[in-house]
């Protein structure tokens, strides 16, 4: 197939010849050249449209790939955040349980000493002062700190039910309380996700 430049040149030559002689064959030749030029232009336009369509398909595929990568990054970030929260929550639960146990032991000791003061009418003044000092020592800064920690954990809506060996989770927005056993076959990941999904915000 002749190039565009060749077709134009042929038309120019044909025009020059036509100027010298008014012949039907020259008109036919010009019409043929024009038809070739139009056909070539149509083919070039079709090829351009095909290239544009391919580029659009590639663009769509690229956008889908980017979207998939973003979802993977989001899932990885969420999982990392939950796992990090799992460690913190496990430490919080252990510390909370230890604090509850410590408070129960302290309360038991205090009750024994108070009962001793009430029942023993023959206590001397020195014995009374000694026991009173022991009671005062029960409320030292460490004890006060543990009480504050316990209040903080409870303010988050997490409490331990040691009698039933379970965690109580309060949702302040809904006004509901959910329970979660401390010892079962559930994974730590599930426990953490379950607790955080139900804590009142």
UniProtKB/Swiss-Prot annotation:
One cellular component (GO) term of this entry: Ndc80 complex
Keywords on record: Cell cycle, Cell division, Centromere, Chromosome, Coiled coil, Kinetochore, Mitosis, Nucleus
Organism superkingdom: Eukaryota
GO MF entries: microtubule binding
Coiled-coil ranges from the UniProt annotation: 24-129
Gene3D superfamilies named in the record: 3.30.160.430
Cross-referenced SUPFAM superfamilies: Kinetochore globular domain
GO process annotations (BP): cell division; sister chromatid biorientation
Localisation per UniProt entry: Nucleus; Chromosome, Centromere, Kinetochore
SUBUNIT field: Component of the NDC80 complex, which consists of NDC80, NUF2, SPC24 and SPC25.
Family membership noted in the UniProt record: Belongs to the SPC24 family.
Job description of the protein: Acts as a component of the essential kinetochore-associated NDC80 complex, which is required for chromosome segregation and spindle checkpoint activity.
Annotated protein name in UniProt: Probable kinetochore protein SPC24
Naturally occurring in which organism (per UniProt): Candida glabrata (strain ATCC 2001 / BCRC 20586 / JCM 3761 / NBRC 0622 / NRRL Y-65 / CBS 138) (Yeast)
Lineage: Eukaryota, Fungi, Dikarya, Ascomycota, Saccharomycotina
């Amino acid at each position: 197939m002749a190039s565009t430049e060749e077709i134009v040149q042929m038309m120019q030559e044909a025009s020059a010849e036509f100027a010298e002689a008014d012949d039907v064959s020259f008109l036919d030749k010009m019409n043929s050249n024009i038809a070739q030029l139009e056909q070539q232009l149509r083919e070039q336009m079709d090829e351009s449209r095909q290239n544009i369509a391919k580029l659009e398909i590639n663009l769509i595929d690229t956008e889908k790939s980017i979207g998939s990568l973003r979802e993977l990054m989001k899932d990885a970030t969420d999982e990392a955040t939950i796992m990090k929260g799992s460690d913190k929550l496990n430490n919080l639960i252990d510390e909370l349980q230890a604090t509850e146990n410590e408070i129960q032991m302290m309360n038991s000791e205090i009750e024994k000493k108070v009962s001793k003061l009430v029942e023993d009418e023959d206590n001397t003044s020195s014995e009374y002062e000694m026991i009173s000092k022991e009671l005062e020592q029960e409320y030292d800064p460490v004890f006060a700190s543990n009480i504050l920690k316990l209040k903080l954990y409870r303010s988050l809506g997490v409490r331990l039910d040691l009698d039933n060996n379970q965690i109580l989770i309060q949702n302040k927005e809904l006004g509901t309380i959910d329970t979660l056993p401390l010892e079962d076959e559930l994974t730590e990941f599930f426990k953490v996700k379950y607790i955080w999904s139900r804590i009142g915000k």
